[in-house]
């Protein structure tokens, strides 16, 4: 972790948005489709969710997801990072993992983890069976935003920024 504060940093640009994806253990879940998963959540199925740390985008995602489903905040288990969360989802420590695709792609490809709902409007080619929240009529889009920053006070004229990325600053 950095000891820098926001006041000590200057943004350079956004790198990417990684949509939040709700994933389940393929072998241990009763949900075989995104529709079954959403129906179960709306019906009040008691599920334990996992994410990275407390107070992060994962934690906020679980809260907002439950709220959109008309449910109270479920049990949330914080893990040290996405890799640990994906491993613990496979092990059965949680019922649902709030992950980005890059954090669990190997487990998805192995058939251990099944992505259910992409909290975005755009489908993702590597996970064609997952549905977007928008496709399912759920107005909830959340992503991990990744970007670049430098120390505040750096003369930005010394940093080459290509024209296509300049509007992102």
PLM ranges: what are they?
Residues 48-50, 97, 116:
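Short, well-ordered beta-strand segments
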Residues 125-129:
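Short, charged, surface-exposed secondary-structure boundary motifs
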Residues 39-41, 64, 68, 83-97, ...:
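Short helices/loops that flank or line small-molecule/ion binding pockets
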Residues 10, 37, 112-124:
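Conserved helix-loop-beta element of the AMP-binding
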Residues 1, 81-82, 99-104, 119-121, ...:
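Beta->alpha turn/N-cap motifs
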Residues 1-4, 106-118:
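Extracytoplasmic "Venus flytrap"/periplasmic binding protein-like
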């Amino acid at each position: 972790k950095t000891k820098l504060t926001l006041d000590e940093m200057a943004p350079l640009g956004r790198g990417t948005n990684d949509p939040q994806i709700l994933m389940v253990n393929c072998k241990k879940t009763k949900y075989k489709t995104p529709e079954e998963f959403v129906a179960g959540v709306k019906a009040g199925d008691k599920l334990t969710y996992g994410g990275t740390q407390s107070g992060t985008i994962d934690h906020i995602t679980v809260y907002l997801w439950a709220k959109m489903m008309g449910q109270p905040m479920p049990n949330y288990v914080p893990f040290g990072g996405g890799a640990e969360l994906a491993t613990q989802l496979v092990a059965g420590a949680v019922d649902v993992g709030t992950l980005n695709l890059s954090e669990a792609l190997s487990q998805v490809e192995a058939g251990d983890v099944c992505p259910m709902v992409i909290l975005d409007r755009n489908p993702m080619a590597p996970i064609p069976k997952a549905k977007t929240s928008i496709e399912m009529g759920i107005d909830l889009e959340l992503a991990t935003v990744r970007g670049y920053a430098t120390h505040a006070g750096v003369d930005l004229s010394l940093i080459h920024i290509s024209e296509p990325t300049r509007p992102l600053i």
